[in-house]
From Swiss-Prot:
One Pfam family here: Complex1_49kDa
Enzyme Commission number, as recorded: 7.1.1.-
Subunit structure as annotated in this protein's UniProt entry: NDH-1 is composed of 14 different subunits. Subunits NuoB, C, D, E, F, and G constitute the peripheral sector of the complex.
Organism, as annotated: Rickettsia rickettsii (strain Sheila Smith)
Name of the gene: nuoD
Top-level taxon of origin: Bacteria
Disulfide-bonded cysteines: none
This protein's name: NADH-quinone oxidoreductase subunit D
Enzyme class: translocase
Annotated catalysed reactions: a quinone + NADH + 5 H(+)(in) = a quinol + NAD(+) + 4 H(+)(out)
Function according to Swiss-Prot or TrEMBL: NDH-1 shuttles electrons from NADH, via FMN and iron-sulfur (Fe-S) centers, to quinones in the respiratory chain. The immediate electron acceptor for the enzyme in this species is believed to be ubiquinone. Couples the redox reaction to proton translocation (for every two electrons transferred, four hydrogen ions are translocated across the cytoplasmic membrane), and thus conserves the redox energy in a proton gradient.
Length: 391
């Protein structure tokens, strides 16, 4: 007796709302069951790494905002740390606290979108609407410090571009006081919801070994029970002074990854509170005149200051020859920047390690044996953004 079962090849995307970007997925289906999932990437490739080679170190910063455009400040942070490492530049404490504060606000910004859109993919519309109200408040904080709601261009090698406006810390404090009850509301909708658990529990299971072998990081790694977080294991700026826990899952399924992200937001609130309480007075960028432009007041009084400002923004500054790799714990995982300098005002090579790139490669083994509808759930818990995957 011969088995004449015929598999079907199905194209999912790239114009599909559940692919979270321009993902083309070629699925080999046996009826409703997925045999293989082959992701085709590159539809949003802009050659960012090559473009950065032709820009000064200051001009390169906005390119990082446009990678994972849901969490821009975390990526600026990685690039700023890499340049500071080559320059051996000391960052003022106030600037370090501001960076950590906004990195954690960015984490909340990212996770609220992920959990909201994940719920929407599965059929629950309410969490998205509730969480978007909270995201709007964080985007206003972005706008207050940088003038932009999305592509902030706020972090700089040596500090941040501008100090916090008067009253902003009080506004952030009010936000984090009212935010936990909103998270409790989301949890009351989802955590023990029968349909939610049926769609997430035991779907897309990743063992600890598989997570390590595939190079997973962030909630994808911690969801499998590995307590690895760069803020703890390799702290940067003032994270070593912060008191927080690293949430981990047990089963490595979609439900654990959702829950890890939910718990991470509570930990981010703790860190933000500590930043507000400990925020020191002082400078917000290094006093090295080669890195920091003169103030507007000085430029109005001194021709030399005006020339200095013009030269700094047109020619930039020279960075000593050398190479470095700096990584931050971005909301999606380990975001790293390998920087190679030959001593000029432009990087010779800038290699970007995006966490979503590794996570998407694991979609094939995570989807095998599941139904077509479960693939949508798995894609949602990967938390992928094609700006950083395609670069």
């Amino acid at each position: 007796m011969t088995n004449n079962t015929k598999t079907i090849t199905l194209n999912l995307g790239p114009q599909h709302p559940a692919t979270h970007g321009v993902l083309r997925l070629i699925l080999e289906m046996d009826g409703e069951v997925v045999n293989n999932a082959d992701p085709h990437i590159g539809l949003l490739h802009r050659g960012t790494e090559k473009l950065i080679e032709h820009k000064t170190y200051l001009q390169a910063i906005p390119y990082f905002d446009r990678l994972d455009y849901v969490s821009p400040m975390c990526q600026e942070h990685a690039f700023a740390l890499a340049v500071e490492s080559l320059l051996e530049c000391k960052v003022p404490r106030r600037a370090q606290f501001i960076r950590v504060l906004f990195s954690e606000l960015t984490r909340i910004l990212n996770h609220t979108l992920n959990i909201g859109s994940q719920a929407l993919d599965i059929g629950a519309t309410t969490p998205l609407l509730w969480l978007f109200e909270e995201r709007e408040k964080i985007m206003e904080f972005y706008e207050h410090v940088s003038g932009s709601r999305m592509h902030s261009n706020y972090f700089r090698p040596g500090g941040v571009v501008a100090d916090l406006p008067e009253g902003l810390l009080e506004d952030i404090d009010k936000f984090i006081e009212q935010f936990p009850p909103k998270l409790h509301d989301i949890e009351s909708l989802l955590n023990e919801n029968r349909l939610w658990k049926q769609r997430l529990v035991d779907i897309g299971v990743v063992s600890q070994k598989e997570a390590m072998d595939w190079g997973f990081s962030g909630p994808m790694l911690r969801g499998s029970g590995i307590a690895w977080d760069l803020r703890k294991s390799n702290p940067y700026d003032v994270y070593d002074e912060m008191d927080f826990k690293v949430p981990i899952g047990k089963n490595g399924d979609c439900y654990d990854r959702y829950f890890v992200r939910m718990l991470e937001m509570y930990e981010s609130i703790k860190i933000i509170k500590q930043c507000i309480e400990k925020m020191p007075k002082g400078a917000i960028k290094t006093d090295d005149p080669k890195l920091t432009p003169p103030t507007r007041a000085k430029m109005k009084e001194s021709m030399e200051a005006m020339i200095h400002h013009f030269k700094l923004y047109t020619e930039g500054y020279d960075v000593p020859a050398g190479e470095t790799y700096k990584a931050v714990e971005a909301p999606k995982g380990e975001f790293g920047v390998y920087l190679y300098s030959r001593g000029g005002n432009r990087p010779y090579r800038c290699r970007i390690k995006a966490p979503g790139f590794a996570h998407l490669q694991g979609l094939d083994f995570m989807s095998q044996g599941h139904l077509m509808a479960d693939v949508i759930t798995i894609i949602a818990t990967l938390d992928i953004v094609f700006g950083e995957i395609d670069r």
